[in-house]
């Protein structure tokens, strides 16, 4: 069954509920803005309750985050203190992502979006914690990435051409990022460590779009 799903999940002979879960994953990943009330109702009719939707969505969020970083992190591996600092940067939200058992299922974030409480806690920490990049830049990165998916042309931060190109690809098709585009950022003064911080924030924010969309439909 797994081979059939990997070849083409839309025609694979899988249970109706599994098919619905796969359709949710695809929509969150490729067409998050199409995730509306009618789409969610179709999932319910196929046997997915809110718990199953939430669990599938959390898996999808982490998949989209990890794959973007894997596609983007194609420059030399850092060593020594640099690697230790990067590890800290990648992990600084990990305990917050897990949250506490007493946490509510969702929270309305400072940006007005509804999302899992632990995920929002990790995201807010990622934007504000001390790093080599300034928090205002990280907020601009997050706003720019969100705008790529939501097709918003209002209040988009003005970024350099090199950073704009990089973040557009990171948002929509990270596998297309070129070495030359990373080099252009280095030429602007970004170190590899700073690029890693920007990439983590951008990938996290892009992965949030589908998750936010689902939670808005479920709980707003």
Question: What are these language model-derived features?
Answer:
Residues 1-220:
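Hydrophobic alpha-helical segments
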């Amino acid at each position: 069954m797994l081979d059939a799903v990997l070849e083409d999940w839309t025609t694979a002979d899988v249970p109706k509920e599994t098919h619905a879960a796969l359709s949710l994953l695809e929509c969150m990943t490729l067409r998050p803005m199409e995730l509306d009330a009618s789409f969610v109702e179709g999932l319910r009719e196929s046997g997915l309750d809110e718990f199953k939707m939430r669990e599938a969505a959390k898996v999808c969020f982490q998949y989209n985050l990890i794959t973007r970083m894997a596609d983007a992190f194609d420059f030399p591996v850092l060593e020594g203190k640099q690697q230790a600092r990067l590890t800290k940067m990648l992990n600084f939200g990990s305990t917050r992502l897990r949250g506490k058992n007493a946490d509510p299922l969702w929270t309305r974030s400072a940006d007005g979006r509804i999302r899992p409480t632990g995920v929002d806690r990790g995201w807010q920490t990622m934007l504000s914690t001390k790093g080599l990049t300034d928090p205002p830049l990280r907020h601009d990165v997050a706003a720019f990435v969100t705008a790529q998916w939501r097709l918003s042309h209002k209040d988009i931060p003005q970024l350099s051409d090199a950073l704009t190109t990089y973040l557009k690809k990171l948002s929509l098709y990270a596998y297309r990022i070129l070495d030359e585009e990373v080099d252009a950022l280095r030429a602007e003064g970004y170190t590899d460590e700073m690029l890693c911080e920007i990439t983590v924030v951008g990938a996290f924010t892009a992965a949030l779009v589908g998750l936010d969309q689902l939670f808005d439909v479920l709980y707003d």
